[in-house]
Amino acid sequence: MKLNLNTDFTKFPRAVSVLAAGEAGAAPAFAKAVLAHDERHLRRRAVELTDGSKVLVDLPEPVALNDGDRLVLEDGRHVEIIAAPEEVYDIRARDGVHLTELAWHIGNRHLAAGIEADRIVILRDHVIKAMLEGLGATVREVSEPFKPVRGAYSGGHDHGHAHAHSHAEAHSHAHGESHSHSHSHSHDDHHHHDHD
C-alpha cells in the first residue's frame, strides 16, 4: 500500500498487540485486512483494511502474522488478518519419501514453503518449477493463500545461538547430472541468554 508522505499517521487507530488465531474467543473483529505473506511480516506500518480505512500497526517487535490472527487496537477492537490469494505452485509427489526429497531440495534453496501431508506450496519461480519437474514432481499453478511454515528463527526474537559450518561438496545423481554446492554460514560461537 502506497501512502502519501504527508499522511498524518497519528489519526489512524493504533494496533499495539497481536492475538493468535483462535485466542480471541467469540469476540467479533470490527474489520479485516487481506495481506500477502510478505505483508504479514509487520512491526510498524500502516495497513489498509477491506473497507478502505487504515490502521497503524505499532508493535514492540516484528511479528509474522498468520491467517486468522488478530491485531488488537488501543481501544480493544480487533482487526482479523486474512491471507490473500497469491500465485503459487501446488507440488505433488509420487509418495511420502518423494515428497520429503522434494522438501529437502526446496529447503536447501532457502525457499519459503507451505508443507502439508500430501503437497508442498511455494511461490512461483520457473527455475524451481523446472528443477522440481526434473525430480519427478507434478507442479500445478494455482492461486490461493500462501501460508509458509515459520522457520526456527522466525519467532521475532534472537537468542544469539551460534554455529559455524560450510558445505563444499560435489556429488552426482543416478540420472547422470552432477553439480556442486558451495556456500557457507558463519556465526559468532557465543550463546547469550539474559533471563531475570
UniProtKB/Swiss-Prot annotation:
Domain of life of the source: Bacteria
Major subcellular location class: cytoplasm
Keyword Cytoplasm: yes
Keywords of this entry: Chaperone, Cytoplasm, Nickel, Nickel insertion
Transmembrane segments: none
GO cellular component, one term: cytoplasm
GO molecular function, one term: unfolded protein binding
Keyword Transport among record annotations: no
GO biological process: protein folding; protein-containing complex assembly; urea metabolic process
Compartment(s) of residence: Cytoplasm
Biased composition (Basic and acidic residues): 156-196
Residue ranges, annotated region (Disordered): 150-196
Family affiliation: Belongs to the UreE family.
HAMAP family reported in the protein's UniProt record: UreE
Protein task: Involved in urease metallocenter assembly. Binds nickel. Probably functions as a nickel donor during metallocenter assembly.
Name by which UniProt lists this protein: Urease accessory protein UreE
Organism, as annotated: Mesorhizobium japonicum (strain LMG 29417 / CECT 9101 / MAFF 303099) (Mesorhizobium loti (strain MAFF 303099))
